Amino acid sequence: MSIKWEKKDGTNEGKLTFEIAPEKIKEGLNSAFNRVKKSLNVPGFRKGKVPRQIFNKMYGEEALYQEALNDLLPEAYSNAVKEADINPVDQPQIDVESMESDAAWVLTAKVTVEPEVELGQYKDLEVTKHPTRVLKADIENELNRLQQQEAELVLKEDEPAEQGDTVVIDFEGKIDGEAFDGGKGENHSLELGSGQFIPGFEDQLVGHKAGEEVAVTVTFPEDYQAKDLAGKEAVFDTKIHEVKTKELPELDDEFAKDVDEDVATLEELKAKIKDRLKDQKVAEAKAAIQEEALDIAVENATIGEIPAVMIEDDVHRQMDNFLAGMQNQGISADMYYQLTGTSADDLHKQFEEGAEKRVKTNLVLEAIVKAEKIEPSEDEINAEIKSLAEQYQMDEAAVRSALSDDMLKHDIAVRKVVDEIADSAKQTRDAKKDEE
């Protein structure tokens, strides 16, 4: 097939000229005729049994051209794109240049393609050093968290509430003396200092005892999710039923066994915590180095103007993934917007912020994959399928049928590039030394 790609200078647009060969046209016309004749009623012939020559005489072979083109175009365009070695980012605008019975059909496609990427340095980059040592303070903080988790709430008799205490309250909010939707609650447990309520609400309960009634005056934040309440002052009539304080367990062997049945002593628990924190710090350091190295690689690259459609596609992809995650938690898109007081436009704006960076990063990664000629092996593809099957609890055959080899190869190749960029990076900034 003869193809020609002409890119407009200074733009991401161009014209792709390509052909459909006569033998392919013949196959397409035969297929189109076999479909069309099934619905034809021609005098002297049973429905669907009209001969081809009679059809051509009555309607002309040209009557089959559009039907045949609809069949042939997807493959012809796809092959032309591959041969031209371009990466379209939007649906093409197809025009027919010539359609003759005994010659190749000639078509043109107005195509928007990915911007050109000129790679800069992406190996041996200098990045910040991320310490992975586990310090005594880290272990103590985790033990304190476990203590808080295992703490018991004990009633405070005739004692005022303090930060960190839990109060059980009834409340009803009013604006200008009028109650509003969502402003009332009964027997609600609230930890003071948790930030669960509007700023200022919890602070005004500190110093009060069980049985007392408190008028809590607050102002809703300007960016409050319920737009009709944003920026308004409200008074909450609040009745305190109970004040409870946390009673922390002793840090001893019994505590250790309570929080982890696989250990027998506090020292064993500390050792296990240290190992877990070490793994966590190593993983966090790896992620931070990857992110920093990628950012530098993108900065070092020269990237053409990003087509608007690429930004929009990324935003919609992020939105779809986010809402799918919500749906998996039983929250529909409409329910999410209602609960958060937002809209699809708000979510769109939220994901617009990082869209250009994400698109540029993907372009650079794909350029490196191409430059390094990275081609995942069959073993790597099989391992990826097995991993995905385990992750989503699916049959491996189902995963393979759901994902194309090209998609799997792309994901594996990009991941390998990210690892290679990070692994080659030099951690030049010394971390602050702390005692273990």
From Swiss-Prot:
Chief localization: cytoplasm
Entry's localization field: Cytoplasm
GO cellular component entries: cytoplasm
PPIase FKBP-type domain sequence ranges: 164-249
Molecular functions (GO terms): peptidyl-prolyl cis-trans isomerase activity; protein folding chaperone; ribosome binding
Any single biological process term in GO: 'de novo' cotranslational protein folding
UniProt keyword Cytoplasm present: yes
Name of the top EC class for this enzyme: isomerase
Pfam families given in the database record: FKBP_C, Trigger_C, Trigger_N
InterPro entries named among the record's database cross-references: PPIase_dom_sf, PPIase_FKBP_dom, Trig_fac, Trigger_fac_C, Trigger_fac_C_sf, Trigger_fac_ribosome-bd_bac, Trigger_fac_ribosome-bd_sf, Trigger_fact/SurA_dom_sf
PROSITE patterns registered for this protein in UniProt: FKBP_PPIASE
EC number assigned by the record: 5.2.1.8
Keywords carried by this UniProt record: Cell cycle, Cell division, Chaperone, Cytoplasm, Isomerase, Rotamase
Catalysed reaction equations from the record: [protein]-peptidylproline (omega=180) = [protein]-peptidylproline (omega=0)
Domain remark from Swiss-Prot or TrEMBL: Consists of 3 domains; the N-terminus binds the ribosome, the middle domain has PPIase activity, while the C-terminus has intrinsic chaperone activity on its own.
UniProt function note: Involved in protein export. Acts as a chaperone by maintaining the newly synthesized protein in an open conformation. Functions as a peptidyl-prolyl cis-trans isomerase.
HAMAP family (UniProt xref): Trigger_factor_Tig
Matches recorded under PANTHER family: TRIGGER FACTOR CHAPERONE AND PEPTIDYL-PROLYL CIS/TRANS ISOMERASE, TRIGGER FACTOR-LIKE PROTEIN TIG, CHLOROPLASTIC
Family of the protein in this entry: Belongs to the FKBP-type PPIase family. Tig subfamily.
Protein name, as recorded: Trigger factor
Gene that this sequence comes from: tig
